[in-house]
């Protein structure tokens, strides 16, 4: 099982998931540090999730459904501190709008970035996500 999962894009933004030191058990509960590097602004949040496998499923479904998918595929953390919305065009480009939100005592912070991915990279991204989140694909 991998300790980090990184998506790098040719055009800029980088999204990184890392296991937090108090990570419990993959598949049941997980604490992660999620970092969005979108120069010149970078930000990180601690994300706790009861069902971390759902993030791997999001990337796996994206790798299967990019062609012909209508509309936007969306996933959101329980507390809304991480939101990802994926859409595709007819040329095989997948745009994943990513939002990191932190609310510290009423001081709301938001960092956004759009990762533009090539369809050919999606299977590799899905495999990396499966390894990080401990998800066993049915494929």
Predicted regions mapped to residue ranges:
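Surface loops and adjacent helix of pleckstrin homology
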Residues: 20, 48, 60, 87, ...
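Intrinsic, low-complexity N-terminal interaction/targeting segments
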Residues: 25-33, 74, 82-107
């Amino acid at each position: 099982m991998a300790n980090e999962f990184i998506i790098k894009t040719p055009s800029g933004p980088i999204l990184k998931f890392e296991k937090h030191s108090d990570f419990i058990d993959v598949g049941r509960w997980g604490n992660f540090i999620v970092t969005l590097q979108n120069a010149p602004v970078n930000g990180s949040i601690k994300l706790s999730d009861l069902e971390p496998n759902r993030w791997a499923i999001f990337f796996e479904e994206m790798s299967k459904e990019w062609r012909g998918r209508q509309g936007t595929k969306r996933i959101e953390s329980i507390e809304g501190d991480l939101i990802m919305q994926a859409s595709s065009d007819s040329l095989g480009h997948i745009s994943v709008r990513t939002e990191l939100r932190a609310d510290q005592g009423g001081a709301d912070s938001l960092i956004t970035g759009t990762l533009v991915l090539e369809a050919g990279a999606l299977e590799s991204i899905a495999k990396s996500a499966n390894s990080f989140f401990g998800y066993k694909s049915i494929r």
